[in-house]
């Protein structure tokens, strides 16, 4: 794990003992800090019994603490801890800020910080894969992979300095203040998480803060999309140099990247390539990484081809903006619409405007969940709609209707919480359903 002398003798309260919170506690204790930990779950508290103080930070005096470390899921806009900590003069931070404070004691390294409404995980995993394929010592963390404080410190090797590649949500950025990055990237920005922010401008301001967390030789990569330029200009303080990344993109080699299809993955690949260039990788090393990238579960994941029908698990698409590129990835051929689209769940918006430009690629929509009726009304003027309610029914109908060369795709454009614990369970369930329905079919 990552430890630091900077934590020794200091006093921390930790709220939330899931993966990142527990890793923070372990690191702080190993570093010689005094820790008071709390979680609503009995088993999480019991796991630390006898090793540190167990108390709810809302029930203790915070004066004298050096920081309160909270999990990103704690809604600071509504949680009373925010006011209590402020009154006590105690900062509220996250595990990424702990990593930031440990940076000066780590072997010389680079940090990459990647954010955006959509594409963060793919771009983070892609940068990590390209670096690893090139022989660079690297780990990925933040909103993906193992908690960063649970990772072992990286050492330089004959390929150069090691690289920590961090996927950072707006919630994590809100809890981070001193991170020093060699490169930061804001991939895109569209309205999301508005239950945590006063308005879109506040959400954009959170994202833009990452652009100013640079080391003295760092660079920020920014998108040229119209919806991103205004908020970036308003909130990015231009601490370091920056580059604008935008279309037209060169797609001439995209056919060689099987796990990076669609316009959104082309954009992810362009950002990843620029980031790796800033880390001194050669064009050849970057090209090899793009060709060999295996993809991530639930993100345009190819489950197989059955009787000529390609099945795609894009359960991570929890809003219309993230579904739109998936609908664009398989355009109609000679007038034949190829996509059988399974959509619905817990809607984040009352429209599908961002998907509308690609409705011409969809043969039929199979609506599920709480948003099924709304989506049916929105889509009926543009395509055949089959109300299904449940994912198993939608999958069966879509597979039955699809012809060789077609695509059956779960890309819900919705959150999962009406029927599933999270998007991962939804995607895993889809995979299981497809497996059962295609047992007797040839897969390729």
Model-predicted segments: where are they?
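Short, basic phosphate-binding NTP loop
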Residues: 1-113, 134, 291, 299-301, ...
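Nucleotide phosphate-binding/pyrophosphate-handling subdomain across enzymes
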Residues: 3-12, 21-31, 257-362, 377
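Phosphate-binding loop of NTP-binding sites
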Residues: 11, 29, 61-63, 72, ...
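Residue-level signal for inorganic ion chemistry
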Residues: 16, 28, 68, 114, ...
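Residues in the short beta-alpha loop(s) of Rossmann-like NAD(P)-binding domains
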Residues: 18, 41, 144, 225-226, ...
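Short internal beta-strands
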Residues: 34-40, 220-224, 342-343, 360-370
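Short beta-strand "acidic-cap" motif of Rossmann-like dinucleotide-binding folds
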Residues: 35-39, 139-140, 165, 410
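C-terminal helical cap/extension that packs against the catalytic core
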Residues: 352-406, 442-443
């Amino acid at each position: 794990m990552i430890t630091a002398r900077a934590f020794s003798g200091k006093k921390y309260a930790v709220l939330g003992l899931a993966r990142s919170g527990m890793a923070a506690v372990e690191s702080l204790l190993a570093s010689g800090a005094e820790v008071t930990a709390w979680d609503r779950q009995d088993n999480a508290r019991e796991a630390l019994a006898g090793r540190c103080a167990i108390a709810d930070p809302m029930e203790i005096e915070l004066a004298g603490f050096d920081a309160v470390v909270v999990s990103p899921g704690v809604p600071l806009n509504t949680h009373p801890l925010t006011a209590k900590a402020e009154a006590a003069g105690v900062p509220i931070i996250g595990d990424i800020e702990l990593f930031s404070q440990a940076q000066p004691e780590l072997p010389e390294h680079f940090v990459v910080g990647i954010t955006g409404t959509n594409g963060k995980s793919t771009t983070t995993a892609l940068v990590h894969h390209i670096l690893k394929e090139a022989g660079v010592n690297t780990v990925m963390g933040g909103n993906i992979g193992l908690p960063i404080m649970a990772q072992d410190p990286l050492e330089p090797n004959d390929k150069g300095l090691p690289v920590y590649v961090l996927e950072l949500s707006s919630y994590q950025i809100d809890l981070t203040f001193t991170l020093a990055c060699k490169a930061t990237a804001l991939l895109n920005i569209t309205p999301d998480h508005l239950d945590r922010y006063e308005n879109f401008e506040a959400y954009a301001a959170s994202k833009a803060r990452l652009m100013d967390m640079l080391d003295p030789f760092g660079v920020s990569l920014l998108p040229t999309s119209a919806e991103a330029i205004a908020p970036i200009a308003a909130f990015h303080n231009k601490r370091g140099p920056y580059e604008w990344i935008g279309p037209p993109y060169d797609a001439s080699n995209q056919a060689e990247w099987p796990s990076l299809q669609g316009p959104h993955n082309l954009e992810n690949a362009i950002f990843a390539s620029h980031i790796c260039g800033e880390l001194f990788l050669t064009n050849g090393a970057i090209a090899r990484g793009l060709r060999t990238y295996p993809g991530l579960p639930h993100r345009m994941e190819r489950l197989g081809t059955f009787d000529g029908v390609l099945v795609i698990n894009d359960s991570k698409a929890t809003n219309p903006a993230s579904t739109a590129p998936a609908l664009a990835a398989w355009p109609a051929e000679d007038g034949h619409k190829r996509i059988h689209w399974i959509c619905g769940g817990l809607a984040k918006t009352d429209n599908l405007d961002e998907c509308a430009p690609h409705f011409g690629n969809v043969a039929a929509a199979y609506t599920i969940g709480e948003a099924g009726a709304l989506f049916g009304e929105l889509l009926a003027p543009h395509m055949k709609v089959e109300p299904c309610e449940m994912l198993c029914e939608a999958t069966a109908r879509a597979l039955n209707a699809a012809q060789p060369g077609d695509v059956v795709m779960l890309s819900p454009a919705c959150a999962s919480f009406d029927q599933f614990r999270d998007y991962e369970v939804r995607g895993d369930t889809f995979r299981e359903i497809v497996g059962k329905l295609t047992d007797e079919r040839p897969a390729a």
